[in-house]
A protein has these predicted regions:
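Short membrane-interface loop/juxtamembrane segments of multi-pass integral membrane proteins
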Residues: 94-118, 178-189
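Select subsegments of transmembrane alpha-helices in polytopic membrane proteins
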Residues: 26-35, 118-129, 182-189
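Membrane-proximal helix-loop-helix units in multi-pass membrane proteins
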Residues: 112-178
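Membrane-interface segments at the starts/ends of alpha-helical transmembrane spans
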Residues: 16-23, 50-66, 184-188
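Hydrophobic alpha-helical transmembrane segments in multi-pass integral membrane proteins
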Residues: 187-204
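Hydrophobic alpha-helical membrane-embedded segments
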Residues: 31-47, 54-91, 140-143, 150-163, ...
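Transmembrane helix interruption/hinge and helix-loop junction motifs
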Residues: 140-147, 199-208
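Short, charged cytosolic
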Residues: 1-10, 88-106
Length: 226
């Protein structure tokens, strides 16, 4: 697997940050701005969230349409080997970014590694499903409104890059040192959009389906090309 610490956003450096890290820092700032704008809309212009109503996506333009396009493009870039400014951890499933090791493969050690990382990955999966079900239950029982449930997706959108750039709690389970070797690196969208499963409507379900597709492609590549 191709590894270059200069290209890994989560790798701290005592020298000046790499180009890709600078880009990720700017993206984090951008996502924080998105969170603040969405929070402002929640109180000042709640009608902007009508795009979440069933087929409301097609009724009138809104600020959330811009966010939908950004999210959709981001997921498409995960599905194609584009030369975009994204971490190697997100592209390592493509042949173009693969460098085979020179030593003979220890198949037993490889199998043990695959099993251990997969077990760790699905511990994370179970925890996230539990969190998603908890949020969904709060929504279904009317404790939190739909717009607030959507805001959790935006919060997760910010937390995604906090995990990459600052600190990731999932490393405690995954036991990996950096995002480049992370088994669940491209789980970001399926985790981010999981609250939208309960929202329904074209806006939410189009993102959920696309996120599920990106996740399935990632998982298939890991199984076929470990």
């Amino acid at each position: 697997m191709l590894e270059n610490n200069n290209d890994i956003p989560c790798t701290p450096s005592k020298s000046s940050p790499s180009k890709i890290r600078k880009i990720y820092i700017l993206r984090l700032v951008g996502r924080i701005v998105v969170l603040l704008v969405c929070a402002a809309l929640l109180f000042l212009a709640p009608e902007q969230f009508e795009v979440l109503d069933g087929w409301g996506f097609f009724r009138s333009p809104s600020a959330l349409h811009v966010l939908w396009v950004i999210w959709l493009i981001d997921m498409i870039l995960q599905l194609i080997p584009a030369k975009a400014n994204i971490s190697l951890g997100s592209k390592k499933n493509f042949m173009a970014y693969f460098l085979p090791i020179k030593e003979k493969i220890n198949k037993r050690a490889l199998k043990e590694y695959i099993l251990s990382t997969t077990r760790a990955a699905y511990k994370v999966f179970i925890i996230w499903v539990a969190l998603t079900l908890a949020l969904g239950t709060l929504y279904l029982f009317g404790i939190i409104p739909r717009n607030v449930l959507f805001m959790f997706t935006v919060i997760f959108y910010v937390c995604d890059l906090i995990c990459v750039l600052i600190w990731c709690p999932f490393r405690l389970i995954m036991k990996n040192k950096c995002c480049t070797t992370c088994r669940i690196f491209n789980w970001d969208h399926i985790m981010m959009f999981s609250p939208l499963i309960f929202v329904g409507g074209f806006f939410a379900w189009s993102l959920v389906v696309m996120a599920a597709l990106a996740w399935l492609v990632w998982e298939a590549c890991i199984i076929i090309y470990p």
